[in-house]
């Protein structure tokens, strides 16, 4: 069995790790970095760029450069958070036929799992290049507060990328695994505060030693799947836009190119202000009007940035309070606070967390890598390479069904340890009712309509009976990935109906299979593109070498030689501009043949010159050779 890799599929950055010889190794990508920007770009010549290459060209190609797509995964187009995102990103977010939020690039609609699959493919290849063998299995992390649709969509992304997703685990739980595996014996309770690029999670986790086994039990989890570093960037961007408007009267919001440059500058300034008190945001030629080019130059202090984002930081405290309450604990019961996610490097975040929990957070966990490390450990547990770890995760939100009067009736309460199974008996609302619709919901509100609809199915052919008489047993079964299976059974007839919840949205099996096929076809297309690029490079090199040879040959090349070679050169140059690899190779071969007589003539002349060198010169060269004396030096080091 091959290795099971651990992937942190982040909103802003992604990371891949593997357990090797008992140690976790975070794998560097082709660019030499341990994290990869979760950015995908589609270029004008049909190439798909992922990671740093995509980020580098974002300024010149904003409409076709996709970032923070994780914020859209498993979401409906109508959701407020999606509508808010549409205003902020330069690329196009559109409504899919099934009502989901998709993106549109170059006239083609694509599902978020399809886009995320490109990042996962890059992670998969990074691991394969390092291990020197194919990788087909992975553990992928998701925010703890992801609902069923979002988890399912993440699993779909893995399948599209050619990965068998062995387990979906929560990011804070993964971070706790990374932190707790090598800790001293004894029980302790930790808070994992995970503020990433696009999501916020907090989990209360008890790490216990049971019969020599590390047991990680999640007591409670809470969060906000639309709060993260991207929102901090947006606040700073808005401030810079306002300052520039005050100064020049120009609103940059309608200029995608300027906004992309601003986004990069804001992110850089935010990072700098974690270690300095003040920074300059300087963007020359950011735009132009009738009076000429305009430059943006704004000084931003740490205090200013903190005032812009203070309410965002405060928004993270209420989920912390709720998680503690759900776990039945007080702040004083917490032994350690672990910070995860790049945004936790901000001093204001660290200060706010320390004030709330009454203790400084640990600094020995790398906030960018801990989640991938934990995923790799879980992968090793599933592969049987690590024996002394037991992970008990929870479902983040209450699951139930809609009952009479539009009420949400919960079957599995939030923070229930998974996997779990729960049944409850319901009945009909009307006399002689022949069918019931089971409407599955997820959320904490009493009103059914206020919760997330996960799907509906019908149980038909119920024998006629007065209302309240038929007994319909509804069973909810959550697997270890946090994905829900629901069944309904008429106890009188034994008739049963069941579904794996794929959400009222989500991708159908046919769509996923099509995307898997597309991804495989793209891999073939990518290989052909690489081969074509290599052929073009070889063609260019041969053109350059041949032109150099003609120049060096001077009058040794006859007019006939030159004419033959120039004709072949022209044909190869034309072929290099085209897209036919076979044509390029054929014209390279033709040019080599055309230039061979001249090359042979020049080689023969050079050889003749070597033989004709005066004997006196050779004798003189021999006289110049000096015998050197040497002494052996012993190295005693």
Curated annotation (Swiss-Prot):
Pfam families: HSP70
InterPro entries assigned to the protein according to its UniProt record, in alphabetical order: ATPase_NBD (IPR043129), Chaperone_DnaK (IPR012725), Heat_shock_70_CS (IPR018181), HSP70_C_sf (IPR029048), HSP70_peptide-bd_sf (IPR029047), Hsp_70_fam (IPR013126)
GO molecular function per UniProt: ATP binding; ATP-dependent protein folding chaperone; unfolded protein binding
CDD domains xrefs: ASKHA_NBD_HSP70_DnaK-like (cd10234)
Keyword Transcription regulation recorded: no
Signals that turn on the gene: By stress conditions e.g. heat shock.
UniProt protein name: Chaperone protein DnaK
Name of the coding gene: dnaK
């Amino acid at each position: 069995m091959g290795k099971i890799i651990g992937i942190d599929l982040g909103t802003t950055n992604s990371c891949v790790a593997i357990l090797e010889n008992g140690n976790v190794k975070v794998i560097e990508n082709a660019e030499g970095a341990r994290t990869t920007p979760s950015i995908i770009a589609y270029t004008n010549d049909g190439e798909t760029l992922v990671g740093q290459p995509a980020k580098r060209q974002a300024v010149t190609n904003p409409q076709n450069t996709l970032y923070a797509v994780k914020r859209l995964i498993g979401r409906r187009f109508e959701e407020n958070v999606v509508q808010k995102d549409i205003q902020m990103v330069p690329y196009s977010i559109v409504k899919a036929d099934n009502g989901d939020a998709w993106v549109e690039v170059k006239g083609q609609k694509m599902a978020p799992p399809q886009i995320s699959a490109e990042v996962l493919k890059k992670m998969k290849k990074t691991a394969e290049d390092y291990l020197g063998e194919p990788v087909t299995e992975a553990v992928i992390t998701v925010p703890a507060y992801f609902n069923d649709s979002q988890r399912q969509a993440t699993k779909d992304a893995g399948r599209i990328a050619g990965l068998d997703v062995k387990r979906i685990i929560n990011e804070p739980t993964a971070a706790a695994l990374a932190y707790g595996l090598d800790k001293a014996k004894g029980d302790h309770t930790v808070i994992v505060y995970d503020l990433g690029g696009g999501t916020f999670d907090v989990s209360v986790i008890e790490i216990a030693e049971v019969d020599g086994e590390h047991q990680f039990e999640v007591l409670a989890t809470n969060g906000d799947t639309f709060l993260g570093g991207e929102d901090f960037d947006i606040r700073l961007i808005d401030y810079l836009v306002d300052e520039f408007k005050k100064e020049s009267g120009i609103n940059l919001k309608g200029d995608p190119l300027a906004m992309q440059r601003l986004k990069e500058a804001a992110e850089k300034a935010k990072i700098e202000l974690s270690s300095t008190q003040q920074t300059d945001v300087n963007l020359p030629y950011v735009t132009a009007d009738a009076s000429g080019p305009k430059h943006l130059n704004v000084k931003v202090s740490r205090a200013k940035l903190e005032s812009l984002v203070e309410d965002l930081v405060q928004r993270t405290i209420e989920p912390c309070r709720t998680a503690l309450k759900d776990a039945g604990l007080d702040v004083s019961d917490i032994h350690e606070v672990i910070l995860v996610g790049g945004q936790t490097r901000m001093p204001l975040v660290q200060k706010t967390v320390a004030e709330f929990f009454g203790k400084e957070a640990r600094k020995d966990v790398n906030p960018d890598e801990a989640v991938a490390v934990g995923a790799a450990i879980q992968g090793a547990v599933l592969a049987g390479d690590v024996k002394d770890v037991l992970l008990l995760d929870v479902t983040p939100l209450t699951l139930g069904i809609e009952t009479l009067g539009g009420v949400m009736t919960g079957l599995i309460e939030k923070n229930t340890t998974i996997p779990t199974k729960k049944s409850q008996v319901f009945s009909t609302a009307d006399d002689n009712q022949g069918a019931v619709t089971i409407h599955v919901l997820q959320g904490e509100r009493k009103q059914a309509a206020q919760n997330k609809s996960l799907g509906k199915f019908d149980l038909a052919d119920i024998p006629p009976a007065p209302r309240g008489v038929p007994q319909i047993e509804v069973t909810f079964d959550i697997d270890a990935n946090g994905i829900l299976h629901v069944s309904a059974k008429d106890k009188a007839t034994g008739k049963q109906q069941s579904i794996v919840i794929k959400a009222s949205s989500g991708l159908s099996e046919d769509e996923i299979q099509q995307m898997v096929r597309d991804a495989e076809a793209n891999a073939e297309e990518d290989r052909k593109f690489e081969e074509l690029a290599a052929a073009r490079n070889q063609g260019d090199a041969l053109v350059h070498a041949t032109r150099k040879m003609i120049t060096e040959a001077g009058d040794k090349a006859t007019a006939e030689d030159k004419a033959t070679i120039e004709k072949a050169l022209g044909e190869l140059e034309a072929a290099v501009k085209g897209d036919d690899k076979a044509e390029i190779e054929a014209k390279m071969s033709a040019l080599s043949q055309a230039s061979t007589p001249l090359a042979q003539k020049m080689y023969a002349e050079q050889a003749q010159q070597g033989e004709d060198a005066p004997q006196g010169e050779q004798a003189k060269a021999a006289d110049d050779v000096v015998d050197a004396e040497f002494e052996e030096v012993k190295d005693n080091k």
